[in-house]
Amino acid sequence: MRKPAFGVSALLIALTLGACSMAPTYERPAAPVADSWSGAAAQRQGAAIDTLDWKSFIVDAELRRLVDMALDNNRSLRQTLLDIEAARAQYRIQRADRVPGLNAAATGNRQRQPADLSAGNRSEVASSYQVGLALPEYELDLFGRVKSLTDAALQQYLASEEAARAARIALVAEVSQAYLSYDGALRRLALTRQTLVSREYSFALIDQRRAAGAATALDYQEALGLVEQARAEQERNLRQKQQAFNALVLLLGSDDAAQAIPRSPGQRPKLLQDIAPGTPSELIERRPDILAAEHRLRARNADIGAARAAFFPRISLTGSFGTSSAEMSGLFDGGSRSWSFLPTLTLPIFDGGRNRANLSLAEARKDSAVAAYEGTIQTAFREVADALAASDTLRREEKALRALANSSNEALKLAKARYESGVDNHLRYLDAQRSSFLNEIAFIDGSTQRQIALVDLFRALGGGWDEGRSLVVHRGGRS
């Protein structure tokens, strides 16, 4: 009567024993970068990136609507989110090994014994039946092998979550930049069409004056050249607009994406104009690709614990408890109770160097993960430095281009007045038209590039994420 209790007690002891981890104590590698930003970036003022989500960064309502659509429908993002489910399932599978299972089992067996093998020199048919609960093989994790494998699976799962956050931030940036390029093409196209109408009108007047002998062939050819220049620029802008439109449709991923994209330029500015970069240490705690790299490093560290534990004895438990009988009708009769308890001790003696090779492999993979982590930090800091430099210089460039465009427009007005009053010839007026148009185009391009650079800075700093939006995707619908 006490033996079953002994088996149950042994099982309870196994559950309460804490595994001693063989994994090395984790220490975050020192960041291979400076402790502060250099130059003007250290004094840069603006919204704090750690409290700035993308909806606050994007001030244009149309762009916010398109980004929301992309986050709900983009296929590449959906694939990344499904990878989270796979990593979560893998972690749950590995975690299940830390607790014993329990199965209900029923077996029946009939066996014929030939006469020459039986004690009575005659053939016999024996039957046995059993029903009860069975404990599948359960490893008593004394040296932390299973715990280390579970920790590694957990870190891989957490890394996949950070990768999904990085993918979302990247999608916000890609949609924003595609929309900014599209909006810039619309602005250039509107200016080009307006310029083409004006030049065609001027060309018609020159043609009439040439027929009357009041304009030269040179005036005629110069005016025609400006018309053809505007036509070529119009076709170029039409091509760029359509390419940006197609890129947006792909990113949005919705069947009605084409109808959702506006056909005219939107408001300006579209983005928050000033962002403070924070400190380098904050960047390490915020950028999802850095956090994902650290989770992968932690997983490799846990793998070393599992590899070390393989050198030590492994204890497994199996058992069952139920009733047995030679007749099915006797399974629940008095005295039919049966049980078994089978502990197994496995001690590695010779494995051809397999365990040592596995340990060397785990250590090499950890060293590789350290290098990858440090490389990710260096890449992140390079991206931030580039984005800060681009944002600052493009802001000053945009200001200069605006002044240049305004100056060219004033010069065009003066040239037109001087031409109409007969002070200057037509060539001077045409040259002022050409300069004004090119400088207006340059200002539109510079303004677009500065907005795109702000998006680059937002992404490089780790972006801001709407924590209310789930990272889980439902396979039957949208994420």
Swiss-Prot record:
Subcellular location(s) of the protein: Cell outer membrane
GO function term, MF aspect, one: transmembrane transporter activity
Residues where lipid is bound covalently (N-palmitoyl cysteine): C20
UniProt entry keywords in alphabetical sequence: Antibiotic resistance, Cell outer membrane, Lipoprotein, Membrane, Palmitate, Signal, Transmembrane, Transmembrane beta strand
A single GO cellular-component term on record: cell outer membrane
InterPro entries: OMF, OMP_efflux, RND_efflux_OM_lipoprot_NodT
Residue ranges of the region described as Disordered: 102-121
Membrane topology: Lipid-anchor
Cross-referenced Pfam families: OEP (PF02321)
Function field: Channel-forming component of a multidrug resistance efflux pump.
Family under the similarity heading: Belongs to the outer membrane factor (OMF) (TC 1.B.17) family.
Protein name in the entry: Outer membrane protein OprJ
Gene behind the chain: oprJ
